[in-house]
């Protein structure tokens, strides 16, 4: 039995590598556009992460699968991964000076059960000029990040305040993952690295 991280995200891999838990990273073949947003961000991220898990279950029928999906959400609007630098610019402009929420759905399953939980983190951006947004975009590859930004590194220049789990904004909330893994008998505490 293997543990499969069903994600192409280097940040999720980085977070899981905080622990000595052996895993393989496999990109799910799943079109996120096929899941409609029904107005509830919690249900939406859970549906997305479940879809990723389902897309891998046939390939790994007896293994433990970990999948996650993250969105940025503000006043009824979902900000996913931007399709262009221009869209990322507009996202950052719209988020600048305002609070928004980052939701991540976590799905952990084995051949017998599926555990799902979500995490919400509230983020307040600094007010940003167009020039500051352009400078930020010159340093950050935005295409694979919900909302077109990241919390780590240069993200500290655009984020004024954060309420909740920092690692949720990176894409994999550690405590939520710990709770899901414990439901299938894996104690993440036993895999702490020195």
Curated annotation (Swiss-Prot):
Protein name per Swiss-Prot or TrEMBL: dTTP/UTP pyrophosphatase
SUPFAM superfamilies xrefs: ITPase-like (SSF52972)
Cofactor requirements of the protein: a divalent metal cation
Site (described: Important for substrate specificity): 11, 70, 152
Keywords associated with the record: Cytoplasm, Hydrolase, Nucleotide metabolism
Free-text function comment from the UniProt entry: Nucleoside triphosphate pyrophosphatase that hydrolyzes dTTP and UTP. May have a dual role in cell division arrest and in preventing the incorporation of modified nucleotides into cellular nucleic acids.
Predominant location category: cytoplasm
Keyword Cytoplasm attached: yes
Enzyme class (EC, first level): hydrolase
Catalytic machinery residues: 69
Alphabetical GO biological process terms: nucleotide metabolic process
Higher taxonomy: Bacteria, Pseudomonadati, Chlamydiota, Chlamydiia, Parachlamydiales
């Amino acid at each position: 039995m293997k543990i499969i991280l069903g994600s192409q995200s280097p940040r999720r891999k980085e977070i899981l590598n905080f622990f000595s838990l052996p895993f393989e990273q496999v990109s799910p073949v799943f079109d996120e556009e096929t899941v409609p947003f029904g107005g509830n961000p919690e249900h939406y991220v859970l549906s997305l992460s479940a879809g990723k898990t389902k897309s891998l279950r046939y390939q790994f029928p007896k293994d433990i699968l970990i999948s996650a999906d993250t969105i940025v959400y503000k006043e009824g609007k979902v900000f996913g991964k931007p399709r262009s630098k221009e869209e990322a610019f507009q996202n950052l402009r719209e988020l600048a000076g305002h609070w928004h929420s980052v939701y991540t759905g976590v799905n952990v399953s084995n051949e017998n059960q599926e555990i799902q939980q979500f995490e919400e983190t509230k983020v307040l951006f600094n007010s940003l000029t167009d020039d500051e947004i352009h400078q930020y975009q010159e340093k950050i590859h935005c295409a694979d990040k919900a909302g077109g930004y990241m919390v780590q590194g240069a993200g500290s220049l655009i984020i004024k305040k954060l309420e909740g789990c920092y690692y949720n904004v990176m894409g994999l909330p550690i405590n939520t993952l710990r709770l899901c893994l414990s439901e299938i008998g894996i104690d993440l505490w036993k895999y702490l690295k020195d």
